Amino acid sequence: MNNSPSDYPETASGLHAASNPAEVLDLLMEGNRRFQSGTLAPHDYRSLIDSTANGQNPVAIVLSCIDSRVPVEQVFDTSVGDIFSARVAGNVIGATTLGGIEYAVGVSGVRLIVVLGHTRCGAATAAVEAVVKGHNPPQATECIHLPSILEKMAPLIDKDQLADF
Protein backbone atom coordinates (compact mmCIF):
# COMPACT_ATOMS: atom_id res chain seq x y z
CA MET A 1 0.00 0.00 0.00
CA ASN A 2 2.95 2.37 0.53
CA ASN A 3 3.26 3.91 -2.88
CA SER A 4 6.21 5.93 -4.02
CA PRO A 5 5.71 9.69 -3.94
CA SER A 6 6.65 9.70 -7.63
CA ASP A 7 3.52 7.62 -8.31
CA TYR A 8 1.40 10.71 -7.71
CA PRO A 9 1.40 14.23 -9.10
CA GLU A 10 2.94 17.06 -7.13
CA THR A 11 0.26 19.33 -5.72
CA ALA A 12 0.48 23.05 -5.14
CA SER A 13 1.36 22.45 -1.49
CA GLY A 14 4.67 20.75 -2.33
CA LEU A 15 4.04 18.30 0.52
CA HIS A 16 4.95 15.18 -1.44
CA ALA A 17 8.53 16.41 -1.80
CA ALA A 18 8.97 16.37 1.99
CA SER A 19 11.05 13.44 3.19
CA ASN A 20 10.73 13.74 6.98
CA PRO A 21 8.24 14.95 9.60
CA ALA A 22 10.00 18.30 10.15
CA GLU A 23 9.81 19.13 6.43
CA VAL A 24 6.13 18.14 6.31
CA LEU A 25 5.41 20.36 9.32
CA ASP A 26 7.32 23.27 7.76
CA LEU A 27 5.27 22.96 4.56
CA LEU A 28 2.01 22.76 6.52
CA MET A 29 3.01 25.89 8.42
CA GLU A 30 3.82 27.64 5.12
CA GLY A 31 0.35 26.67 3.91
CA ASN A 32 -1.15 28.06 7.10
CA ARG A 33 0.65 31.36 6.54
CA ARG A 34 -0.82 31.49 3.02
CA PHE A 35 -4.26 30.79 4.49
CA GLN A 36 -3.86 33.55 7.08
CA SER A 37 -2.72 36.06 4.47
CA GLY A 38 -5.42 35.08 1.97
CA THR A 39 -2.90 34.07 -0.71
CA LEU A 40 -3.79 30.42 -1.21
CA ALA A 41 -2.02 28.39 -3.89
CA PRO A 42 -4.07 27.50 -6.98
CA HIS A 43 -5.49 23.97 -6.97
CA ASP A 44 -6.61 22.13 -10.10
CA TYR A 45 -9.08 19.91 -8.26
CA ARG A 46 -10.41 18.09 -11.34
CA SER A 47 -6.91 17.03 -12.35
CA LEU A 48 -5.99 16.03 -8.79
CA ILE A 49 -9.17 14.00 -8.35
CA ASP A 50 -8.48 12.17 -11.61
CA SER A 51 -4.81 11.56 -10.79
CA THR A 52 -5.55 10.16 -7.33
CA ALA A 53 -8.47 7.97 -8.40
CA ASN A 54 -6.35 4.81 -8.29
CA GLY A 55 -4.38 5.53 -5.13
CA GLN A 56 -3.20 8.07 -2.65
CA ASN A 57 -0.03 9.02 -0.82
CA PRO A 58 -0.88 11.50 1.96
CA VAL A 59 2.10 12.70 3.97
CA ALA A 60 0.30 13.64 7.20
CA ILE A 61 -2.82 12.93 9.20
CA VAL A 62 -4.50 15.82 10.96
CA LEU A 63 -6.79 15.18 13.93
CA SER A 64 -9.06 18.16 14.40
CA CYS A 65 -12.40 19.18 15.81
CA ILE A 66 -15.56 19.05 13.73
CA ASP A 67 -15.92 22.82 14.05
CA SER A 68 -16.94 24.24 10.68
CA ARG A 69 -14.69 27.26 11.20
CA VAL A 70 -11.57 25.07 11.02
CA PRO A 71 -11.54 23.48 7.53
CA VAL A 72 -8.30 21.54 7.76
CA GLU A 73 -7.41 21.35 4.07
CA GLN A 74 -7.92 25.10 3.70
CA VAL A 75 -6.19 26.00 6.98
CA PHE A 76 -3.02 24.29 5.69
CA ASP A 77 -3.64 25.15 2.00
CA THR A 78 -3.46 21.49 1.02
CA SER A 79 -5.22 19.70 -1.79
CA VAL A 80 -6.65 16.36 -2.85
CA GLY A 81 -4.27 13.56 -1.86
CA ASP A 82 -2.06 15.62 0.48
CA ILE A 83 -3.38 14.70 3.94
CA PHE A 84 -5.71 12.41 5.81
CA SER A 85 -8.15 14.33 7.97
CA ALA A 86 -9.87 12.88 11.06
CA ARG A 87 -12.44 15.15 12.67
CA VAL A 88 -14.25 14.61 15.95
CA ALA A 89 -15.84 16.99 18.46
CA GLY A 90 -13.26 18.26 20.93
CA ASN A 91 -10.50 16.12 19.39
CA VAL A 92 -11.61 13.29 21.68
CA ILE A 93 -10.87 10.02 19.93
CA GLY A 94 -12.26 6.56 20.39
CA ALA A 95 -11.23 3.21 18.97
CA THR A 96 -12.49 3.83 15.43
CA THR A 97 -10.71 7.17 15.03
CA LEU A 98 -7.57 5.70 16.55
CA GLY A 99 -7.84 2.85 14.05
CA GLY A 100 -7.91 5.38 11.24
CA ILE A 101 -4.80 7.09 12.59
CA GLU A 102 -3.07 3.71 12.88
CA TYR A 103 -3.97 2.96 9.26
CA ALA A 104 -2.57 6.32 8.13
CA VAL A 105 0.74 5.68 9.89
CA GLY A 106 1.15 1.92 9.70
CA VAL A 107 -0.34 1.11 6.31
CA SER A 108 -0.25 4.33 4.32
CA GLY A 109 3.05 5.54 5.77
CA VAL A 110 2.25 9.15 6.64
CA ARG A 111 5.22 11.03 8.02
CA LEU A 112 3.47 13.30 10.53
CA ILE A 113 0.53 13.29 12.95
CA VAL A 114 -0.90 16.74 13.72
CA VAL A 115 -3.41 17.39 16.50
CA LEU A 116 -5.04 20.71 15.63
CA GLY A 117 -6.86 22.57 18.37
CA HIS A 118 -8.79 25.80 18.03
CA THR A 119 -10.31 28.58 20.10
CA ARG A 120 -13.93 28.71 21.24
CA CYS A 121 -14.45 24.96 20.94
CA GLY A 122 -18.10 24.14 21.64
CA ALA A 123 -17.31 20.67 23.01
CA ALA A 124 -14.65 22.04 25.37
CA THR A 125 -17.01 24.82 26.46
CA ALA A 126 -19.79 22.30 27.17
CA ALA A 127 -17.39 20.13 29.19
CA VAL A 128 -16.15 23.11 31.22
CA GLU A 129 -19.71 24.32 31.85
CA ALA A 130 -20.71 20.86 33.04
CA VAL A 131 -17.81 20.81 35.52
CA VAL A 132 -18.36 24.40 36.72
CA LYS A 133 -22.11 23.94 37.18
CA GLY A 134 -21.72 20.46 38.63
CA HIS A 135 -23.89 18.90 35.93
CA ASN A 136 -23.35 15.52 34.44
CA PRO A 137 -22.79 15.69 30.66
CA PRO A 138 -26.33 14.67 29.60
CA GLN A 139 -27.79 17.48 31.73
CA ALA A 140 -25.35 19.97 30.23
CA THR A 141 -26.25 19.33 26.60
CA GLU A 142 -29.55 17.47 26.39
CA CYS A 143 -27.86 15.34 23.71
CA ILE A 144 -27.86 11.57 23.66
CA HIS A 145 -24.36 10.80 22.34
CA LEU A 146 -22.35 13.97 23.02
CA PRO A 147 -21.97 13.02 26.71
CA SER A 148 -19.60 10.21 25.70
CA ILE A 149 -17.21 12.92 24.49
CA LEU A 150 -17.77 15.27 27.43
CA GLU A 151 -17.26 12.45 29.93
CA LYS A 152 -13.76 11.92 28.52
CA MET A 153 -12.99 15.64 28.74
CA ALA A 154 -14.39 16.38 32.22
CA PRO A 155 -11.64 14.63 34.24
CA LEU A 156 -9.05 16.78 32.46
CA ILE A 157 -10.63 20.02 33.66
CA ASP A 158 -9.24 21.52 36.85
CA LYS A 159 -12.01 23.71 38.24
CA ASP A 160 -9.47 25.62 40.36
CA GLN A 161 -7.58 26.66 37.21
CA LEU A 162 -10.61 28.25 35.59
CA ALA A 163 -10.78 32.03 35.85
CA ASP A 164 -14.02 33.92 35.28
CA PHE A 165 -15.77 31.18 33.42
Outline where the language-model segments fall:
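Short, intrinsically disordered/low-complexity patches at protein termini
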Residues: 60-61, 109
